[in-house]
Protein backbone atom coordinates (compact mmCIF):
# COMPACT_ATOMS: atom_id res chain seq x y z
CA UNK A 1 0.00 0.00 0.00
CA UNK A 2 1.27 3.48 -0.82
CA UNK A 3 2.83 4.99 2.31
CA UNK A 4 0.93 8.29 2.15
CA UNK A 5 -2.53 6.65 2.20
CA UNK A 6 -4.71 6.20 5.27
CA UNK A 7 -4.05 2.70 6.58
CA UNK A 8 -7.74 1.83 7.06
CA UNK A 9 -8.38 2.19 3.33
CA UNK A 10 -6.51 -1.06 2.69
CA UNK A 11 -9.45 -3.07 3.98
CA UNK A 12 -12.09 -1.36 1.84
CA UNK A 13 -13.57 -2.79 -1.34
CA UNK A 14 -14.67 -0.60 -4.24
CA UNK A 15 -18.38 -0.55 -5.05
CA UNK A 16 -19.08 -2.47 -8.26
CA UNK A 17 -22.27 -1.09 -9.89
CA UNK A 18 -22.51 -3.72 -12.63
CA UNK A 19 -20.60 -6.89 -11.69
CA UNK A 20 -21.07 -8.20 -15.22
CA UNK A 21 -18.86 -5.48 -16.73
CA UNK A 22 -15.53 -6.64 -18.14
CA UNK A 23 -12.12 -5.17 -17.37
CA UNK A 24 -12.68 -2.38 -19.88
CA UNK A 25 -15.95 -1.38 -18.20
CA UNK A 26 -18.10 -2.62 -21.05
CA UNK A 27 -21.25 -4.50 -20.06
CA UNK A 28 -21.70 -7.90 -21.62
CA UNK A 29 -23.89 -7.65 -24.67
CA UNK A 30 -27.22 -9.38 -24.58
CA UNK A 31 -27.37 -9.45 -20.80
CA UNK A 32 -30.64 -8.38 -19.16
CA UNK A 33 -29.44 -5.84 -16.59
CA UNK A 34 -31.93 -6.22 -13.75
CA UNK A 35 -29.40 -5.53 -11.00
CA UNK A 36 -29.53 -1.75 -10.48
CA UNK A 37 -33.24 -0.89 -10.13
CA UNK A 38 -33.14 1.30 -13.21
CA UNK A 39 -36.36 2.09 -15.04
CA UNK A 40 -36.59 -0.45 -17.88
CA UNK A 41 -37.66 2.12 -20.50
CA UNK A 42 -35.44 4.87 -21.87
CA UNK A 43 -36.61 8.47 -22.18
CA UNK A 44 -39.07 8.88 -25.06
CA UNK A 45 -37.46 9.90 -28.34
CA UNK A 46 -39.20 13.28 -28.43
CA UNK A 47 -37.74 14.22 -25.03
CA UNK A 48 -34.30 13.16 -26.15
CA UNK A 49 -34.70 15.38 -29.19
CA UNK A 50 -35.72 18.30 -26.97
CA UNK A 51 -32.64 17.74 -24.85
CA UNK A 52 -30.45 17.62 -27.93
CA UNK A 53 -32.01 20.88 -29.16
CA UNK A 54 -31.37 22.49 -25.77
CA UNK A 55 -27.76 21.38 -25.88
CA UNK A 56 -27.33 22.91 -29.33
CA UNK A 57 -29.30 26.10 -28.85
CA UNK A 58 -29.29 26.97 -25.14
CA UNK A 59 -26.27 25.45 -23.44
CA UNK A 60 -22.96 27.28 -23.64
CA UNK A 61 -20.34 24.55 -23.28
CA UNK A 62 -17.62 27.06 -22.40
CA UNK A 63 -19.58 28.38 -19.40
CA UNK A 64 -19.90 26.82 -15.97
CA UNK A 65 -23.38 25.51 -15.09
CA UNK A 66 -25.80 27.25 -12.74
CA UNK A 67 -23.94 26.70 -9.48
CA UNK A 68 -26.99 27.44 -7.35
CA UNK A 69 -29.38 25.19 -9.32
CA UNK A 70 -32.04 27.88 -8.87
CA UNK A 71 -34.47 26.91 -11.63
CA UNK A 72 -34.21 23.23 -10.83
CA UNK A 73 -34.71 23.83 -7.11
CA UNK A 74 -37.91 25.75 -7.76
CA UNK A 75 -39.19 22.99 -10.07
CA UNK A 76 -38.37 20.32 -7.47
CA UNK A 77 -40.13 22.27 -4.71
CA UNK A 78 -43.25 22.52 -6.85
CA UNK A 79 -43.14 18.77 -7.50
CA UNK A 80 -42.58 17.85 -3.84
CA UNK A 81 -45.50 20.03 -2.74
CA UNK A 82 -47.90 18.11 -4.98
CA UNK A 83 -47.79 15.13 -2.60
CA UNK A 84 -48.19 17.16 0.59
CA UNK A 85 -51.43 18.14 2.35
CA UNK A 86 -50.46 21.82 2.27
CA UNK A 87 -49.09 22.53 -1.22
CA UNK A 88 -46.96 25.50 -0.22
CA UNK A 89 -44.82 24.13 2.59
CA UNK A 90 -41.70 23.59 0.50
CA UNK A 91 -39.78 26.23 -1.44
CA UNK A 92 -36.30 26.40 -2.96
CA UNK A 93 -34.72 27.05 0.45
CA UNK A 94 -35.76 23.52 1.48
CA UNK A 95 -33.90 21.85 -1.43
CA UNK A 96 -30.27 20.89 -2.02
CA UNK A 97 -29.15 19.11 -5.19
CA UNK A 98 -26.35 16.60 -5.53
CA UNK A 99 -24.49 14.67 -8.17
CA UNK A 100 -26.63 11.68 -7.34
CA UNK A 101 -27.91 10.99 -3.84
CA UNK A 102 -24.48 9.51 -3.08
CA UNK A 103 -22.98 13.01 -3.00
CA UNK A 104 -25.66 14.11 -0.55
CA UNK A 105 -25.01 11.10 1.68
CA UNK A 106 -21.32 11.99 1.78
CA UNK A 107 -22.11 15.64 2.51
CA UNK A 108 -24.41 14.68 5.38
CA UNK A 109 -21.70 12.50 6.90
CA UNK A 110 -19.14 15.28 6.58
CA UNK A 111 -21.46 17.72 8.36
CA UNK A 112 -22.27 15.37 11.24
CA UNK A 113 -19.73 12.64 11.94
CA UNK A 114 -16.29 13.51 10.61
CA UNK A 115 -13.26 13.54 12.94
CA UNK A 116 -14.84 11.07 15.36
CA UNK A 117 -17.74 13.42 16.07
CA UNK A 118 -20.32 10.71 15.47
CA UNK A 119 -21.28 7.25 14.23
CA UNK A 120 -24.13 6.16 11.99
CA UNK A 121 -26.83 3.55 12.53
CA UNK A 122 -28.24 1.34 9.77
CA UNK A 123 -30.66 -1.58 9.82
CA UNK A 124 -29.35 -4.28 7.50
CA UNK A 125 -30.01 -5.43 4.88
CA UNK A 126 -30.30 -1.96 3.39
CA UNK A 127 -28.69 0.31 0.78
CA UNK A 128 -24.97 -0.43 0.99
CA UNK A 129 -23.70 3.08 0.22
CA UNK A 130 -24.45 4.34 3.73
CA UNK A 131 -21.90 1.91 5.16
CA UNK A 132 -19.46 2.23 2.26
CA UNK A 133 -19.43 6.03 2.34
CA UNK A 134 -19.07 6.15 6.11
CA UNK A 135 -16.17 3.70 6.06
CA UNK A 136 -14.31 5.69 3.40
CA UNK A 137 -14.52 8.69 5.74
CA UNK A 138 -13.41 6.73 8.80
CA UNK A 139 -16.84 6.99 10.43
CA UNK A 140 -18.00 4.08 12.65
CA UNK A 141 -21.05 2.13 11.49
CA UNK A 142 -23.45 0.51 13.96
CA UNK A 143 -25.70 -2.10 12.36
CA UNK A 144 -28.85 -3.64 13.79
CA UNK A 145 -31.01 -6.34 12.30
CA UNK A 146 -34.48 -6.63 10.87
CA UNK A 147 -37.33 -9.03 11.49
CA UNK A 148 -36.54 -11.97 9.16
CA UNK A 149 -40.21 -12.40 8.25
CA UNK A 150 -41.23 -8.77 7.66
CA UNK A 151 -37.89 -6.92 7.42
CA UNK A 152 -39.13 -4.35 9.92
CA UNK A 153 -36.32 -2.61 11.78
CA UNK A 154 -35.49 -4.06 15.19
CA UNK A 155 -36.35 -0.77 16.89
CA UNK A 156 -35.53 -2.11 20.35
CA UNK A 157 -32.02 -3.03 19.26
CA UNK A 158 -31.67 0.29 17.46
CA UNK A 159 -32.75 2.23 20.54
CA UNK A 160 -30.37 0.22 22.72
CA UNK A 161 -27.51 0.97 20.34
CA UNK A 162 -28.28 4.68 20.47
CA UNK A 163 -28.38 4.69 24.26
CA UNK A 164 -25.24 2.58 24.65
CA UNK A 165 -21.95 4.28 25.47
CA UNK A 166 -18.84 2.59 24.14
CA UNK A 167 -15.34 3.65 25.03
CA UNK A 168 -13.95 3.60 21.50
CA UNK A 169 -17.04 4.76 19.63
CA UNK A 170 -18.51 8.25 19.31
CA UNK A 171 -22.28 8.67 19.84
CA UNK A 172 -24.67 7.86 17.03
CA UNK A 173 -25.41 11.09 15.19
CA UNK A 174 -27.20 9.82 12.05
CA UNK A 175 -29.86 7.16 11.49
CA UNK A 176 -30.35 6.05 7.87
CA UNK A 177 -33.60 4.41 6.73
CA UNK A 178 -35.06 3.76 3.29
CA UNK A 179 -38.76 4.12 2.52
CA UNK A 180 -39.38 1.64 0.92
CA UNK A 181 -36.25 -0.26 1.83
CA UNK A 182 -33.75 -1.58 -0.68
CA UNK A 183 -33.26 -4.49 -1.21
CA UNK A 184 -36.35 -5.80 0.61
CA UNK A 185 -39.06 -3.49 -0.77
CA UNK A 186 -40.98 -2.89 2.47
CA UNK A 187 -42.09 0.60 3.46
CA UNK A 188 -41.70 2.03 6.94
CA UNK A 189 -44.48 0.84 9.23
CA UNK A 190 -46.41 3.13 11.56
CA UNK A 191 -44.40 1.71 14.48
CA UNK A 192 -41.10 2.43 12.74
CA UNK A 193 -42.20 5.96 11.90
CA UNK A 194 -43.26 6.55 15.49
CA UNK A 195 -39.88 5.35 16.73
CA UNK A 196 -38.12 7.77 14.38
CA UNK A 197 -40.24 10.59 15.80
CA UNK A 198 -38.98 9.80 19.29
CA UNK A 199 -35.33 10.33 18.37
CA UNK A 200 -33.79 13.41 20.01
CA UNK A 201 -32.86 16.53 18.03
CA UNK A 202 -29.14 15.76 18.25
CA UNK A 203 -29.64 12.76 15.92
CA UNK A 204 -30.16 13.37 12.22
CA UNK A 205 -32.84 11.15 10.68
CA UNK A 206 -32.16 10.49 6.99
CA UNK A 207 -35.13 9.01 5.11
CA UNK A 208 -34.15 7.85 1.64
CA UNK A 209 -37.19 7.99 -0.66
CA UNK A 210 -35.41 6.91 -3.84
CA UNK A 211 -38.47 4.78 -4.71
CA UNK A 212 -41.13 7.31 -3.72
CA UNK A 213 -42.74 7.41 -7.16
CA UNK A 214 -43.44 3.67 -7.04
CA UNK A 215 -45.18 3.71 -3.65
CA UNK A 216 -46.48 7.33 -3.43
CA UNK A 217 -45.86 7.38 0.32
CA UNK A 218 -43.72 10.22 1.64
CA UNK A 219 -42.64 11.69 4.95
CA UNK A 220 -41.51 14.96 3.37
CA UNK A 221 -44.20 16.89 5.22
CA UNK A 222 -42.47 16.06 8.52
CA UNK A 223 -39.53 18.35 7.80
CA UNK A 224 -41.67 21.42 8.45
CA UNK A 225 -41.75 20.59 12.15
CA UNK A 226 -38.64 18.39 12.50
CA UNK A 227 -35.36 20.21 11.94
CA UNK A 228 -33.41 16.96 12.37
CA UNK A 229 -35.15 15.13 9.50
CA UNK A 230 -34.04 15.11 5.88
CA UNK A 231 -35.52 13.35 2.84
CA UNK A 232 -33.36 12.08 -0.03
CA UNK A 233 -34.73 11.43 -3.52
CA UNK A 234 -33.38 10.79 -6.99
CA UNK A 235 -34.12 11.23 -10.68
CA UNK A 236 -32.36 7.92 -11.44
CA UNK A 237 -35.37 5.64 -10.98
CA UNK A 238 -38.87 6.68 -12.06
CA UNK A 239 -37.63 9.71 -14.02
CA UNK A 240 -35.19 7.54 -16.07
CA UNK A 241 -32.19 9.84 -15.65
CA UNK A 242 -29.68 7.43 -14.10
CA UNK A 243 -27.11 8.51 -16.69
CA UNK A 244 -27.42 12.12 -15.53
CA UNK A 245 -26.81 11.54 -11.78
CA UNK A 246 -29.29 13.95 -10.20
CA UNK A 247 -30.27 13.54 -6.56
CA UNK A 248 -31.88 15.98 -4.17
CA UNK A 249 -32.50 16.54 -0.49
CA UNK A 250 -35.52 18.10 1.23
CA UNK A 251 -35.03 19.55 4.71
CA UNK A 252 -35.39 22.66 6.80
CA UNK A 253 -33.60 25.76 5.48
CA UNK A 254 -30.99 25.73 8.25
CA UNK A 255 -29.76 22.23 7.39
CA UNK A 256 -29.97 22.91 3.66
CA UNK A 257 -27.82 26.02 4.11
CA UNK A 258 -25.08 23.90 5.69
CA UNK A 259 -25.20 21.38 2.83
CA UNK A 260 -24.89 24.26 0.38
CA UNK A 261 -21.77 25.47 2.21
CA UNK A 262 -19.85 22.23 1.87
CA UNK A 263 -20.89 20.87 -1.52
CA UNK A 264 -18.43 21.22 -4.35
CA UNK A 265 -18.97 24.20 -6.68
CA UNK A 266 -20.68 23.49 -9.99
CA UNK A 267 -21.37 19.94 -8.82
CA UNK A 268 -24.11 19.24 -11.36
CA UNK A 269 -23.41 19.61 -15.09
CA UNK A 270 -25.63 21.98 -17.06
CA UNK A 271 -26.89 19.14 -19.26
CA UNK A 272 -28.01 17.15 -16.22
CA UNK A 273 -29.86 20.19 -14.89
CA UNK A 274 -31.60 20.60 -18.25
CA UNK A 275 -32.55 16.91 -18.27
CA UNK A 276 -34.04 17.07 -14.77
CA UNK A 277 -36.01 20.23 -15.54
CA UNK A 278 -37.35 18.67 -18.72
CA UNK A 279 -38.32 15.47 -16.92
CA UNK A 280 -40.20 17.44 -14.27
CA UNK A 281 -42.01 19.45 -16.92
CA UNK A 282 -43.15 16.16 -18.51
CA UNK A 283 -43.76 14.30 -15.25
CA UNK A 284 -47.38 13.43 -15.94
CA UNK A 285 -46.55 11.43 -19.06
CA UNK A 286 -43.32 9.94 -17.67
CA UNK A 287 -44.79 8.84 -14.35
CA UNK A 288 -47.91 7.45 -16.01
CA UNK A 289 -45.78 4.53 -17.20
CA UNK A 290 -45.16 3.45 -13.62
CA UNK A 291 -48.40 1.53 -14.13
CA UNK A 292 -46.34 -0.87 -16.26
CA UNK A 293 -43.96 -1.44 -13.35
CA UNK A 294 -46.82 -2.20 -10.98
CA UNK A 295 -48.38 -4.65 -13.43
CA UNK A 296 -45.11 -6.42 -14.15
CA UNK A 297 -44.08 -6.48 -10.49
CA UNK A 298 -47.36 -8.18 -9.63
CA UNK A 299 -46.96 -10.61 -12.52
CA UNK A 300 -43.47 -11.57 -11.36
CA UNK A 301 -44.66 -12.02 -7.80
CA UNK A 302 -47.64 -14.18 -8.76
CA UNK A 303 -45.52 -16.34 -11.05
CA UNK A 304 -42.74 -16.88 -8.51
CA UNK A 305 -44.81 -17.24 -5.32
CA UNK A 306 -45.94 -20.85 -6.00
CA UNK A 307 -42.35 -22.12 -6.45
CA UNK A 308 -41.59 -24.20 -3.32
CA UNK A 309 -37.86 -23.42 -3.29
CA UNK A 310 -38.38 -19.65 -3.29
CA UNK A 311 -39.42 -17.29 -0.54
CA UNK A 312 -40.43 -13.79 -1.58
CA UNK A 313 -42.00 -10.70 -0.09
CA UNK A 314 -44.49 -8.07 -1.31
CA UNK A 315 -42.74 -4.96 -2.61
CA UNK A 316 -43.65 -1.28 -2.71
CA UNK A 317 -40.78 -0.48 -5.08
CA UNK A 318 -39.66 -1.43 -8.60
CA UNK A 319 -38.06 -4.71 -7.59
CA UNK A 320 -38.81 -7.87 -5.66
CA UNK A 321 -36.66 -9.70 -3.13
CA UNK A 322 -36.33 -13.48 -3.02
CA UNK A 323 -34.44 -16.04 -0.99
CA UNK A 324 -33.87 -19.78 -1.13
CA UNK A 325 -33.41 -22.11 1.83
CA UNK A 326 -29.75 -21.15 2.31
CA UNK A 327 -27.60 -18.18 1.41
CA UNK A 328 -25.34 -20.46 -0.62
CA UNK A 329 -28.27 -21.70 -2.71
CA UNK A 330 -29.52 -18.15 -3.15
CA UNK A 331 -26.13 -16.92 -4.35
CA UNK A 332 -25.82 -19.88 -6.72
CA UNK A 333 -29.19 -19.11 -8.27
CA UNK A 334 -27.96 -15.59 -8.95
CA UNK A 335 -24.82 -16.90 -10.64
CA UNK A 336 -26.80 -19.40 -12.69
CA UNK A 337 -29.22 -16.72 -13.86
CA UNK A 338 -26.32 -14.54 -14.94
CA UNK A 339 -24.87 -17.43 -16.93
CA UNK A 340 -28.20 -17.67 -18.75
CA UNK A 341 -28.30 -13.93 -19.46
CA UNK A 342 -30.11 -12.28 -16.52
CA UNK A 343 -28.03 -10.18 -14.14
CA UNK A 344 -29.62 -9.58 -10.72
CA UNK A 345 -28.03 -8.47 -7.46
CA UNK A 346 -27.19 -10.76 -4.58
CA UNK A 347 -27.34 -8.66 -1.43
CA UNK A 348 -28.22 -9.14 2.21
CA UNK A 349 -28.56 -12.89 1.78
CA UNK A 350 -31.18 -12.59 -0.97
CA UNK A 351 -31.64 -11.74 -4.62
CA UNK A 352 -33.04 -8.37 -5.63
CA UNK A 353 -34.71 -8.61 -9.03
CA UNK A 354 -35.44 -5.30 -10.76
CA UNK A 355 -38.69 -5.19 -12.70
CA UNK A 356 -37.77 -5.07 -16.38
CA UNK A 357 -39.64 -4.87 -19.62
CA UNK A 358 -42.28 -7.47 -20.42
CA UNK A 359 -39.76 -9.37 -22.54
CA UNK A 360 -37.05 -9.20 -19.87
CA UNK A 361 -39.45 -10.42 -17.21
CA UNK A 362 -40.58 -13.26 -19.47
CA UNK A 363 -36.96 -14.37 -19.78
CA UNK A 364 -36.39 -14.02 -16.03
CA UNK A 365 -39.37 -16.24 -15.25
CA UNK A 366 -38.46 -18.82 -17.88
CA UNK A 367 -34.87 -19.03 -16.63
CA UNK A 368 -35.81 -19.30 -12.95
CA UNK A 369 -38.33 -22.05 -13.71
CA UNK A 370 -35.75 -23.86 -15.83
CA UNK A 371 -33.09 -23.72 -13.11
CA UNK A 372 -35.36 -24.73 -10.25
CA UNK A 373 -36.96 -27.55 -12.22
CA UNK A 374 -33.65 -29.44 -12.31
UniProtKB/Swiss-Prot annotation:
Q: Name one GO biological process term.
A: L-histidine biosynthetic process
Disulfide bonds, which pairs? none
NCBIfam families per record: PRK02610.1
Write down the species.
Cyanothece sp. (strain PCC 7425 / ATCC 29141)
Q: Which reaction does it catalyse?
A: L-histidinol phosphate + 2-oxoglutarate = 3-(imidazol-4-yl)-2-oxopropyl phosphate + L-glutamate
Highest rank taxon of the organism: Bacteria
Q: In which pathway does it act?
A: Amino-acid biosynthesis; L-histidine biosynthesis; L-histidine from 5-phospho-alpha-D-ribose 1-diphosphate: step 7/9
List the Gene3D superfamilies hit by this protein, alphabetically.
Aspartate Aminotransferase, domain 1, Type I PLP-dependent aspartate aminotransferase-like (Major domain)
Q: Pfam families per the record? A: Aminotran_1_2 (PF00155)
GO MF terms listed in the record are: histidinol-phosphate transaminase activity; pyridoxal phosphate binding
Residues recorded as bearing N6-(pyridoxal phosphate)lysine in the entry: 237
The protein's name in its UniProt record: Histidinol-phosphate aminotransferase
What's the subunit arrangement here? Homodimer.
In the record, the note on similarity to other proteins reads: Belongs to the class-II pyridoxal-phosphate-dependent aminotransferase family. Histidinol-phosphate aminotransferase subfamily.
Keyword list (alphabetical) reads:
Amino-acid biosynthesis, Aminotransferase, Histidine biosynthesis, Pyridoxal phosphate, Transferase
Q: Which gene encodes it?
A: hisC
Amino acid sequence: MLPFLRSELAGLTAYVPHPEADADGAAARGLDRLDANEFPLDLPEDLKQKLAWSYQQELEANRYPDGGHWELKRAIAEYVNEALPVPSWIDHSHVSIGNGSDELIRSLLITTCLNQQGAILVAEPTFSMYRITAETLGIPVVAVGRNPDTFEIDCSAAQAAIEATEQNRPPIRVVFVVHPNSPTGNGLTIAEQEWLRTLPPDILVVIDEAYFEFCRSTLAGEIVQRSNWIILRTFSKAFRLAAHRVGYAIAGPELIAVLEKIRLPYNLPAYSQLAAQLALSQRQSLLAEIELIWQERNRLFQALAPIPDLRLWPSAANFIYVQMSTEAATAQLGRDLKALGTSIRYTGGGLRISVGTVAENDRTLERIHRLLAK
